[in-house]
Amino acid sequence: AEIKVRDGYIVYPNNCVYHCGLNPYCNDLCTKNGAKSGYCQWLTKWGNACYCYALPEKVPIKDPSYKCYS
């Protein structure tokens, strides 16, 4: 079966984004989780956050309707 993918801000299980400063950190994080690539998006409403392209559906992405539960 084909793996379903989508783009988004990769999150921890508690819906918190991965904060970042540099693109290589995010690209590494995203590709380790099965994404095509990723980068550090600066100044999102959650701060600087990793964004992944073609991330497998099994890996959670930010759900803006929920808070980050720390």
UniProtKB/Swiss-Prot annotation:
Has the structural arrangement of an alpha-helix connected to antiparallel beta-sheets by disulfide bonds (CS-alpha/beta). Gene3D superfamilies: Knottin, scorpion toxin-like (3.30.30.10). PROSITE patterns: LCN_CSAB. One of its GO terms (cellular component) is extracellular region. GO terms for biological process: defense response. Belongs to the long (4 C-C) scorpion toxin superfamily. Sodium channel inhibitor family. Alpha subfamily. Residues 6-69 form the LCN-type CS-alpha/beta domain. CDD domains: neurotoxins_LC_scorpion (cd23106). Expressed by the venom gland. GO terms for molecular function: sodium channel inhibitor activity; toxin activity. It is found in: Secreted. Alpha toxins bind voltage-independently at site-3 of sodium channels (Nav) and inhibit the inactivation of the activated channels, thereby blocking neuronal transmission. This toxin is active against rat Nav1.2/SCN2A and B.germanica Nav1. Transmembrane segments: none annotated. InterPro entries: LCN-type_CS_alpha_beta_dom (IPR044062), Scorpion_toxin-like (IPR003614), Scorpion_toxin-like_sf (IPR036574), Scorpion_toxinL (IPR018218), Scorpion_toxinL/defensin (IPR002061). SUPFAM superfamilies: Scorpion toxin-like (SSF57095). It comes from Buthus occitanus tunetanus (Common European scorpion). Disulfide bonds join C16-C68, C20-C40, C26-C50, C30-C52. This is Alpha-toxin Bot9.
